[in-house]
Amino acid sequence: MSKKYSNKGYQARNAVQPKKDNTNVIITWVTVGLCLTVMAAIVIAIMAGTGAFSPKAADVDMNEIKSEINSLTAEDFAETNEVTEYVKITVKDYGEIVLRLRPDIAPKTVENFQKLVKEGHYSDKIFHRVIQNFMIQGGGFDGTGKQHEADTVKGEFSDNGYDNNLLHVRGVISMARLGNDNDSASNQFFICDATSSHLDGGYAAFGYVLAGMDVVDAIAAVDTDGNDKPYDNVIIEKAVFVDPLK
């Protein structure tokens, strides 16, 4: 005969059992549930703070940035061998464009761009796609039309789960990519010749022009073919790091 344990020794299976009080059991499970809920909330908060879900870029004051765009000249900067947040692009027959990079907004994008500049990747590349009142795009092809590849980088923009709040206003630099692949940006960049709000959230803006918007405008005005390629090559002679003199 099977038996059960009780406080008074064995009890027969068919013996009348006292009715159990489940109050303490219910309270215990409610307490456990509340504890698990609180712990889950804490974990989520911690992971959100470290960028595990939707990374938070630096807050951006677009009015301040607009006031910075094209506020200086190339003569306000000096070349340096150090990796900095300032890059000067020299365009043959056109002049110089000085960029300020913003790693606080798009860190991986800036890191990739700095790596390419340091390697001399942009020397003798062209602006191969030019659309006036929109943008100038380059960095991936040389004058012969040969495409040069580079490592891809995760797309740091909101459509790809990253909180990039730098808007595509005139003078902003951003990464080109394949339309169907958010993580396909590599070496091709574009500079906005006009505000292009339809790009916000879908492309990784990572800096802006501090000097040389007249150069950008001159390039944007060149004659192009049906594929938006300039008839005459617009050649990037070099891209180097610079430091402000003041």
Where do the protein language model's features map onto the residues?
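Cyclophilin-like peptidyl-prolyl cis-trans isomerases
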Residues: 2-246
